[in-house]
């Protein structure tokens, strides 16, 4: 399985980088992993909705350029479907069985994802109705992918 994580923003926090590096190392036993970071656009506090759309569209263009033909795209979105770890494992396994071995997970910037990215998504996944920093979300996503792949292999995991 080939998994690509496309996220907006460069990771700056050392403690998150350490956790992400750990899960990247663990995941190499189960999948080929590629992480792509798209530069985030400057977004001052008081943007109008039109200015927010411009920022999301610019970030979205960068995301869409990195989605290859044939990739199954899972966008992280507050309006997406919430799954348990076991259900995510089932989803990943069913994608592999259906011949979708190239999966891209998309993490938007602080303003979310553009409409074009959401339209391109084959599936929308929500981890929680709460909002998380997108850098932290990358770590959470990697942990859940790792957990899901261990579930698929029938290996023990912490419940």
UniProtKB/Swiss-Prot annotation:
Q: Where are the transmembrane segments?
A: none
Q: Which GO terms describe its cellular component?
A: cytoplasm
Q: Which PANTHER family match?
A: METHYLTRANSFERASE (PTHR33603), RIBOSOMAL RNA LARGE SUBUNIT METHYLTRANSFERASE H (PTHR33603:SF1)
EC number(s) recorded for this UniProt protein: 2.1.1.177
Query: What is the gene called?
Result: rlmH
Where located? Cytoplasm
What's this protein's name? Ribosomal RNA large subunit methyltransferase H
**Subunit structure comment from the entry:** Homodimer.
GO molecular function per UniProt: rRNA (pseudouridine-N3-)-methyltransferase activity
- The main location class comes to cytoplasm
Main function: Specifically methylates the pseudouridine at position 1915 (m3Psi1915) in 23S rRNA.
* Tagged with keyword Ubl conjugation: no
**Keyword terms of this UniProt record:** Cytoplasm, Methyltransferase, rRNA processing, S-adenosyl-L-methionine, Transferase
**NCBIfam families for this protein:** PRK00103.1-3, tRNA_RlmH_YbeA
- Going by the record, the broad EC class of this enzyme is transferase
> According to its UniProt record, which reaction does this protein catalyse?
pseudouridine(1915) in 23S rRNA + S-adenosyl-L-methionine = N(3)-methylpseudouridine(1915) in 23S rRNA + S-adenosyl-L-homocysteine + H(+)
User: Which InterPro entries does the annotation name?
Assistant: Alpha/beta_knot_MTases, RlmH-like, tRNA_m1G_MTases_N
At which positions is S-adenosyl-L-methionine bound?
76, 108, 127-132
Q: Which Gene3D superfamilies match?
A: 3.40.1280.10
Q: Does the keyword Oxidoreductase apply?
A: no
Annotated source species: Alkaliphilus oremlandii (strain OhILAs) (Clostridium oremlandii (strain OhILAs))
């Amino acid at each position: 399985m080939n998994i690509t994580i496309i996220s907006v923003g460069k990771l700056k926090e050392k403690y998150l980088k350490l956790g992400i590096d750990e899960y990247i190392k663990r995941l190499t036993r189960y999948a080929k992993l590629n992480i792509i970071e798209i530069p985030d656009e400057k977004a001052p506090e008081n943007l109008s909705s039109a200015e927010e759309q411009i920022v999301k569209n610019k970030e979205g263009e960068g995301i869409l350029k990195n989605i290859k033909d044939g990739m199954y795209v899972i966008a992280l979105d507050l309006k997406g479907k919430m799954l348990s770890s076991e259900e995510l494992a089932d989803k990943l396994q069913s994608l592999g069985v259906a011949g979708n071995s190239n999966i891209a997970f998309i993490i938007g910037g602080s303003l979310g994802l553009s409409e074009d990215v959401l339209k391109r998504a084959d599936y929308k996944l929500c981890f929680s109705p709460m909002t998380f920093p997108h850098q932290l979300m990358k770590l959470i996503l990697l942990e859940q992918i790792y957990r899901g792949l261990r579930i698929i292999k029938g290996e023990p995991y912490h419940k």
